[in-house]
């Protein structure tokens, strides 16, 4: 529950299913001491599948948004404007695209379903593939921008990779697509001067981090990977190449 741990721990509903009635009742007794949300009793298989379903559902919805972003890029349409307009329909609620899906739940839980039921879970598996591919696509877009800059300016660019966390305003990097994109860009674009930014982390064991204002100021190419609030305060500079993969 990165970001709202205490609130969600207390206020979220709980689906509880033990191995038998006694264990289920004990779990309900425990959670009722601090949970203000409703406690829903079921069996253990349904409870486990409920958790996997919640996260797989989110993954599928994000995959639709990410696929739209790929289509819009090729069609020359602003995906953010498109989604905002489409969501004005009362029965449409498209999520925001990003550079993939991360975290230790949404990016992981669908595999438990697809591994056990591969024939029946084609939509879930396809969504996982789309969200994984989006990260590779983002890295290739950065590579293209670097090559175009070099051709036009006869020098290597300074590239600011903005954000490592898997979602805004947290310091959790688990399964982060942003981190994977940075690693891939470093691998395939080793002639570029790459500055790596994560304002919610003091240091990282793999990457040397640069303060976000400093990186933005020095950069020729700015790659928005995570929509941290700090990045939204940066002044627009038309002299920079901006690749915004997260809607900053």
Regions picked out by a protein language model, each given a short descriptive name:
Residues 1-248:
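Structural/interface elements that position substrates and couple domains in central-metabolism enzymes
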């Amino acid at each position: 529950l990165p970001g709202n741990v205490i609130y969600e721990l207390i206020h979220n509903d709980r689906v509880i299913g033990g191995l038998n009635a006694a264990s289920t009742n004990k779990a309900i007794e425990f959670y009722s001491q601090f949970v203000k949300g409703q406690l829903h009793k079921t069996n253990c298989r349904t409870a486990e599948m409920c958790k996997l379903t919640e996260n797989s559902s989110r993954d599928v919805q994000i995959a639709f948004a990410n696929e739209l972003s790929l289509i819009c890029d090729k069609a020359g349409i602003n995906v953010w404007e498109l989604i905002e307009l489409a969501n004005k329909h009362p029965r449409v609620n498209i999520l925001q695209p990003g550079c993939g899906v991360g975290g230790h739940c949404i990016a992981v839980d669908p595999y438990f379903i697809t591994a056990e039921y591969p024939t029946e879970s084609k939509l879930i598996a396809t969504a996982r593939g789309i969200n994984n591919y989006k990260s590779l696509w983002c890295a290739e877009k950065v590579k293209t921008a670097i090559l175009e800059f070099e051709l036009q300016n006869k020098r290597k660019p300074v590239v600011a990779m903005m954000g490592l966390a898997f979602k805004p305003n947290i310091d959790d990097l688990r399964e982060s697509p942003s981190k994977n994109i940075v690693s891939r860009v470093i691998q395939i674009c080793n002639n570029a001067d790459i500055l790596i930014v994560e304002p919610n982390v003091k240091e990282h064991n793999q990457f040397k981090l640069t303060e976000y204002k400093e990186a933005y100021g020095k950069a020729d190419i700015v790659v928005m990977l995570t929509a941290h609030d700090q990045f939204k305060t940066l002044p627009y500079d038309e002299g920079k190449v901006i690749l915004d993969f997260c809607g900053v």
